[in-house]
């Protein structure tokens, strides 16, 4: 069934390209060969790191409005073909205008989006979600994005709990600057989750560009809504470009658990890179883990 959906999406994209310039077909394939030790011995594996395929675009309406849309799936070219090979990612229908934009469907929460590009090992083994809660892509959600005012913008995500026993959730974030540090040298954000996937979470994020270095930091406190157990942690990251290469490192803590990562990316072209990284985790109540990987990524 999932394969049929993807084939239909490709067919629709091919047909629609002739009629609407607003449609964009895009994707990313990221694969690593890695040596992994998850506490019970070392082994070798091939992994797809959130490779994806999607369609997105907008269509102009009357009165300064436009309809926006995105349909995105995660694919796994390293795994055997089965029903788990395709997974839904952000998929929504929206309406945009001078008021901002409203999106309805499955979408990254405001707190998740607020971290910008600070997590330098996003989608890899050292993704911040290993130690932290809050990296939620929520279904049954309504998201509102404000226009930018003097560099400030905000996002609010309302999560509908479709059962009498559940509590609706709210995720909100206030951002300043450019999260890619392309149009400004500063990015900062403050975000809050209430009753989102069983946690109340506060996250503060910041990143600056100084003398070529990208320096990032995050602080988070999270509390389980079922057990009231509260935990705190922080993250620091640094990246430095050297010609076609970029060196990067990151350290993350959540209470007594911590992780360290170091890596290098090397551009082979505008949309293609090779890379290598090492990540190590020290857990207080679980087996320690470490990974060494080399990989290739291409975007289209």
Tell where the protein language model's regions lie, with residue ranges.
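Outer-membrane beta-barrel proteins
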Residues: 1-300
């Amino acid at each position: 069934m999932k394969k049929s959906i993807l084939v239909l999406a490709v067919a629709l994209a091919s047909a629609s390209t002739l009629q609407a310039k607003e449609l964009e077909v895009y994707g990313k394939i990221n694969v690593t060969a890695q040596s992994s030790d998850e506490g019970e011995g070392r082994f070798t594996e091939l992994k797809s790191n959130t490779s994806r395929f999607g369609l997105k675009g907008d269509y102009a309406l009357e009165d300064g409005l436009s309809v926006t849309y995105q349909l995105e799936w995660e694919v796994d070219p390293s795994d055997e073909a089965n029903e788990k090979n395709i997974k839904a990612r952000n998929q929504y229908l929206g309406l945009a205008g001078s008021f901002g934009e409203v999106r309805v469907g499955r979408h990254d929460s405001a707190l998740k989006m607020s971290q910008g590009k600070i997590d330098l090992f996003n989608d890899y083994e050292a993704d911040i979600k290993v130690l932290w809660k809050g990296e939620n892509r929520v279904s049954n959600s309504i998201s509102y994005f404000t226009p930018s005012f003097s560099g400030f913008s905000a996002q609010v995500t309302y999560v509908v709990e479709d059962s009498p026993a559940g509590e609706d959730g709210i995720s909100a974030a206030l951002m300043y600057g450019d999260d890619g540090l392309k149009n400004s040298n500063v990015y900062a954000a403050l975000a809050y989750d209430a009753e989102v996937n069983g946690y109340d979470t506060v996250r503060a994020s910041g990143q600056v560009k100084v003398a070529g270095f990208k320096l990032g930091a995050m602080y988070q406190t999270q509390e389980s809504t079922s057990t009231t157990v509260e935990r705190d942690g922080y993250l620091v990251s640094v990246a430095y470009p050297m010609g076609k290469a970029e060196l990067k490192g990151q350290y993350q803590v959540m209470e007594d658990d911590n992780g360290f990562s170091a890596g290098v990316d090397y551009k082979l072209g505008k949309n293609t890179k090779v890379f290598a990284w090492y990540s190590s985790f020290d857990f207080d109540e679980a087996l320690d883990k470490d990974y060494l990987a080399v990989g290739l990524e291409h975007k289209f």
